[in-house]
C-alpha cells in the first residue's frame, strides 16, 4: 500500500496526541552505543526511520525490545564496528553511529547514509569535527572510515555552518574524550538539548546545550539510565496547519509550546486564535480564511525549514499573496509542482516562492518526493474539492506516526490503496 486515497473538502476538528520527536529519538538511539549498560527510552514514535535505526543497532549485536513506545536497549554485546550498507543507505541519521562506534572500538566504518533528497546536506562538518578531536578519517567513494590510536582530546571547535548533525556528532565524540571540548557556533535545536540531557543522564558532563556554545568535559565511562523523548514540534506544527487551512479547531496534547514560538506567531498572524498551556496548544480558525504571511527560514530559534512546505499550503489558500524564503536547504520546493497541479498559484524565484491565494484547491493524482512535502500534499488532499490520490507515501511514514489515522479522527477521510 503505497498510495493514499483522500476525499477532500473536510473541516478538521478535535484533539490529537503528539508523538515523540523522531529527530530527537534517532541520535539518542545511536548514542546508546557509548555505554555497555542497559537503557530505557520512552515516548519513542513508531516510525519507519526508527525501525531502521533499531535494525542497525541489532545488526551490530545489540539486544532491543520495543513495547508500548518504550525501548529497552542493551548494547553490551555489540562486537561489530561497521553497520550494513543496505540499512545505512536508508536513513541519513546513520552518520551518528560513526563517533560512538569510533570511541567504543577505536575504529568505525560507515557507508554513506541516505534519507530525504533535499539538497546536498554535506557531511564534511562531521568529519572536520572528528579530525579536530584527533581522529584519522579516510573518505572513499561509498564510505567513511575512522580510526584512533589514542583517546580523543578535547578542543575548541568552531562549526563553520550551523549544523544539527555536526553538533551532535562532535558533542557525542567529546563526551568520552580527554579534557574539555568547546563547540562554538553550535546548533540550538530542542533535539540537541534532549540528546545532551540523555547523555548527562548516563553520566556525561555537558553544559550549554541549546545555546551557540556547548561545553563538554570528558568522562571516563557512561552508565545506564532512563530517558523520555521530547514531543515532536514539527508534527505539532503540521496538525496546527491542518486545522488552520480547513477553518477548523484543534487541541494538540503532549507537546511543548515553548519550542514553537515562531510557528505560533505566524499562525496568529494568519488569523488563528492561539491558546497554550504547559503541554497543549489550541488553535481556532473557525469561520475564517487564513491571511497570507511572509516567512524566512533560519536555524533554531528561527522559523523551522521543516514547516516551510506546510505554510506554503496555507498561503496557497489564503486571502492574498505571501512570500516564503528558504535559507537552509536548496532544492526544497519540489512539492510546489504538485500543489500547482491542484490549482495553487505558486512562482519560484531563486530561493523564494510567492504564493497567491486561491479560493479552492482541486483533486489530483500527486506524487510525493520528501517527508514534509509528502505531509503537505496529504493535507492539501484533505481540503481540496474532489478525491485526491497521493503516491509514494513512504516518505511521510518516515516522520509521522499514524498520520492518516490521526487525521481521520479529526474528520478526514483517508484510505490506503
Curated annotation (Swiss-Prot):
The modification 2-(S-cysteinyl)pyruvic acid O-phosphothioketal is found at residue 116. Pfam families: EPSP_synthase (PF00275). It catalyses: phosphoenolpyruvate + UDP-N-acetyl-alpha-D-glucosamine = UDP-N-acetyl-3-O-(1-carboxyvinyl)-alpha-D-glucosamine + phosphate. The active site is at residue 116. Transmembrane segments: none annotated. Its EC number is 2.5.1.7. This is UDP-N-acetylglucosamine 1-carboxyvinyltransferase. Phosphoenolpyruvate binds at residues 22-23. It is an enzyme of class 2 (transferase). It is found in: Cytoplasm. InterPro entries: Enolpyruvate_Tfrase_dom (IPR001986), Enolpyruvate_Tfrase_sf (IPR036968), MurA_subfamily (IPR050068), RNA3'P_cycl/enolpyr_Trfase_a/b (IPR013792), UDP_GlcNAc_COvinyl_MurA (IPR005750).
Amino acid at each position: 500500500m503505497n498510495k493514499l486515497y483522500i476525499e477532500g473538502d473536510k473541516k478538521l476538528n478535535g484533539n490529537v496526541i503528539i508523538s515523540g520527536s523522531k529527530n530527537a529519538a534517532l541520535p539518542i538511539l545511536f548514542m546508546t552505543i557509548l555505554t555497555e549498560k542497559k537503557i530505557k527510552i520512552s515516548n519513542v514514535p513508531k516510525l519507519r526511520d526508527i525501525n531502521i535505526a533499531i535494525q542497525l543497532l541489532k545488526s551490530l549485536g545489540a539486544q532491543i525490545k520495543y513495547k508500548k513506545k518504550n525501548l529497552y536497549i542493551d548494547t553490551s554485546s555489540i562486537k561489530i564496528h561497521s553497520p550494513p550498507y543496505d540499512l545505512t543507505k536508508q536513513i541519513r541519521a546513520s552518520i551518528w553511529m560513526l563517533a560512538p562506534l569510533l570511541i567504543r572500538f577505536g575504529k568505525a566504518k560507515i557507508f554513506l547514509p541516505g534519507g530525504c533528497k533535499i539538497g546536498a546536506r554535506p557531511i564534511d562538518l562531521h568529519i572536520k569535527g572528528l579530525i579536530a578531536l584527533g581522529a584519522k578519517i579516510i573518505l572513499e567513494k561509498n564510505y567513511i572510515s575512522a580510526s584512533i590510536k589514542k583517546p580523543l582530546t578535547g578542543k575548541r571547535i568552531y562549526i563553520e555552518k550551523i549544523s544539527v548533525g555536526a553538533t551532535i556528532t562532535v558533542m557525542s565524540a567529546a563526551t568520552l574524550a580527554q579534557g574539555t571540548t568547546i563547540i562554538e557556533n553550535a546548533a540550538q535545536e530542542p533535539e540537541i538539548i534532549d540528546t545532551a540531557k540523555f547523555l548527562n543522564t548516563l553520566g556525561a558532563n555537558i553544559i550549554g546545550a541549546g545555546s551557540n556554545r556547548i561545553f563538554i568535559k570528558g568522562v571516563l565511562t557512561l552508565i545506564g539510565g532512563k530517558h523520555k523523548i521530547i514531543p515532536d514540534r514539527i508534527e505539532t506544527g503540521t496538525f496546527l496547519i491542518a486545522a488552520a487551512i480547513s477553518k477548523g479547531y484543534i487541541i494538540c496534547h503532549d507537546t511543548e509550546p515553548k519550542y514553537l514560538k515562531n510557528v505560533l506567531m505566524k499562525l496568529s498572524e494568519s488569523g488563528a486564535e492561539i491558546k497554550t498551556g504547559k503541554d497543549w496548544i489550541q488553535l481556532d480558525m473557525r469561520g475564517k480564511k487564513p491571511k497570507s504571511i511572509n516567512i524566512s527560514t533560519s536555524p533554531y530559534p528561527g522559523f523551522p525549514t521543516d514547516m516551510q512546505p506546510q505554510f506554503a499550503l496555507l498561503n496557497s489558500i489564503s486571502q492574498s499573496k505571501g512570500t516564503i524564503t528558504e535559507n537552509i536547504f536548496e532544492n526544497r520546493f519540489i512539492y510546489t509542482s504538485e500543489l500547482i497541479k491542484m490549482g495553487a498559484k505558486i512562482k519560484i524565484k531563486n530561493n523564494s516562492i510567492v504564493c497567491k491565494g486561491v479560493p479552492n484547491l482541486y483533486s489530483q493524482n500527486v506524487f510525493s518526493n520528501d517527508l514534509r512535502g509528502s505531509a503537505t500534499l496529504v493535507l492539501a488532499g484533505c481540503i481540496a474539492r474532489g478525491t485526491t490520490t497521493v503516491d509514494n507515501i513512504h516518505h511521510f511514514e518516515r516522520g509521522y506516526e499514524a498520520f492518516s489515522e490521526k487525521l481521520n479522527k479529526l474528520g478526514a477521510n483517508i484510505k490506503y490503496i
